[in-house]
Swiss-Prot record:
Belongs to the FPG family. Involved in base excision repair of DNA damaged by oxidation or by mutagenic agents. Acts as a DNA glycosylase that recognizes and removes damaged bases. Has a preference for oxidized purines, such as 7,8-dihydro-8-oxoguanine (8-oxoG). Has AP (apurinic/apyrimidinic) lyase activity and introduces nicks in the DNA strand. Cleaves the DNA backbone by beta-delta elimination to generate a single-strand break at the site of the removed base with both 3'- and 5'-phosphates. A zinc finger (FPG-type) spans 236-270. Its EC number is 3.2.2.23, 4.2.99.18. InterPro entries: DNA_glyclase/AP_lyase_DNA-bd, DNA_glyclase_Znf_dom_DNA_BS, Formamido-pyr_DNA_Glyclase, FPG_cat, MutM-like_N-ter, Ribosomal_uS13-like_H2TH, Znf_DNA_glyclase/AP_lyase, Znf_FPG/IleRS. Binds 1 zinc ion per subunit. The gene is mutM. Monomer. SMART domains: Fapy_DNA_glyco (SM00898), H2TH (SM01232). CDD domains: EcFpg-like_N. It comes from Pseudomonas aeruginosa (strain ATCC 15692 / DSM 22644 / CIP 104116 / JCM 14847 / LMG 12228 / 1C / PRS 101 / PAO1). GO terms for molecular function: 8-oxo-7,8-dihydroguanine DNA N-glycosylase activity; class I DNA-(apurinic or apyrimidinic site) endonuclease activity; damaged DNA binding; DNA-(apurinic or apyrimidinic site) endonuclease activity; hydrolase activity; zinc ion binding. Keywords: DNA damage, DNA repair, DNA-binding, Glycosidase, Hydrolase, Lyase, Metal-binding, Multifunctional enzyme, Zinc, Zinc-finger. This is Formamidopyrimidine-DNA glycosylase. It comes from the Bacteria.
Length: 270
C-alpha cells in the first residue's frame, strides 16, 4: 500500500504539470472504486483551472477553482502523467485531460482507492478527524507520550493510528521502531517519555529520507513520473523476517500485530 512518502513523492511529481492547467475533460472508465466516483465529476471539473496540488495524510487534494478532488491510492493505485489519447489498459480507470495535451491517469488494479469531490475538503468526513502531519512541529514525542498514558495496546498499532499521527504505515512504523530500539509488541502506555521523544525523531527522520529516495517500491508503486521508489534498499526490518539483523546479526523475527506482519530484532529492540 502506498504510504505517506509514496503519496508525497507522487504529489511532487505531478504538481508542476497540473498547477495552473485547465482541465479539458475527465474520462471515467470504471466508477466502482472503494467509493463510487461521482457521476458528475466531468461536469464539475471540466473547464476549471487546477490551482493547487496538496497532500493531507495519504490523500491527494487537487484544488480547482470551485472545489477539490480528493484522491486516495488505496492498496495498489498510482497517478502518473501520460499524453492525452494514450491507449488505456484494463486497470487504468480515469484520465484527467489537460489543456497542455497531457493527462493525469489513475491506475488501480484492486480498486480500493478513491476519487471524490468536495467543496470543503478539510471538513470532509475522511479528513476532519485526522491527527497531525508527522513532518510538522505539531507532531512530537510529547504528544505520543500523553496520548499513550493508560493504553495497553502495542506501540506499533498505536503509532499507526491516524488519530495519533497520520501517515505512519506498516513499513515506516517498523523501521522507526527499529531505529528507536523499541519492541513493537511493547504496551504503548509503558513506554517512557524519553523513548517517545526518540521515536518521534526517528519517525520524522525516516519519513524524510524515504521521501528523498522517492518512497519504497513494493509490488505496484511508481511515482508520478512512472519511476520506482528506492527506499527499499535501506530497509532494516520490514519484509526481512528470518534474515539476519544488519546491526547485530541476530535472526529477525516475524509476528502478527493488529492483523499485520511485523518484523523486529529481539536483540536491538527492547
Amino acid at each position: 500500500m502506498p504510504e505517506l512518502p509514496e503519496v508525497e513523492t507522487t504529489r511532487r511529481g505531478i504538481a508542476p504539470y497540473l498547477e495552473g492547467q485547465r482541465v479539458e475533460r475527465v474520462i471515467v472508465r470504471e466508477r466502482r472504486l472503494r467509493w463510487p466516483i461521482p457521476e458528475d465529476l466531468d461536469v464539475r471539473l471540466s473547464g476549471q483551472r487546477i490551482v493547487s496540488v496538496e497532500r493531507r495524510a495519504k490523500y491527494l487534494l487537487l484544488g480547482a477553482e470551485a472545489g477539490t478532488l480528493i484522491s486516495h491510492l488505496g492498496m495498489s493505485g498510482s497517478l502518473r502523467l501520460v499524453e492525452s489519447g494514450t491507449p488505456a489498459s484494463r486497470h487504468e480507470h480515469v484520465d484527467i485531460e489537460l489543456a497542455s495535451g497531457m493527462a493525469l491517469r489513475y491506475t488501480d488494479p484492486r480498486r480500493f482507492g478513491a476519487m471524490l469531490w468536495s467543496l470543503a475538503p478539510l471538513e470532509h468526513e475522511l479528513l476532519r478527524n485526522l491527527g497531525p502531519e508527522p513532518l510538522t512541529d505539531a507532531f512530537a514525542g510529547q504528544r505520543l507520550f500523553e496520548l499513550s498514558r493508560g493504553r495497553s495496546m502495542a506501540v506499533k498499532p498505536f503509532i499507526m493510528d491516524n488519530a495519533v499521527v497520520v501517515g505512519v504505515g506498516n513499513i515506516y512504523a517498523s523501521e522507526a521502531l527499529f531505529a528507536a530500539g523499541i519492541d513493537p509488541r511493547k504496551p504503548a502506555g509503558s513506554i517512557s517519555k524519553a523513548r517517545y521523544l526518540r521515536l518521534a525523531e526517528e519517525i520524522k527522520r525516516i519519513l524524510a529520507i524515504a521521501i528523498e529516495r522517492g518512497g519504497t517500491t513494493l509490488r505496484d508503486f511508481v511515482g508520478g513520473d512512472g519511476q520506482p521508489g528506492y527506499f527499499q534498499q535501506e530497509l532494516f526490518v520490514y519484509g526481512r523476517g528470518g534474515e539476519f539483523c544488519k546491526v547485530c546479526g541476530s535472526t529477525l523475527r516475524e509476528i502478527r500485530l493488529g492483523q499485520r506482519a511485523s518484523v523486529y530484532c529481539p536483540r536491538c529492540q527492547r
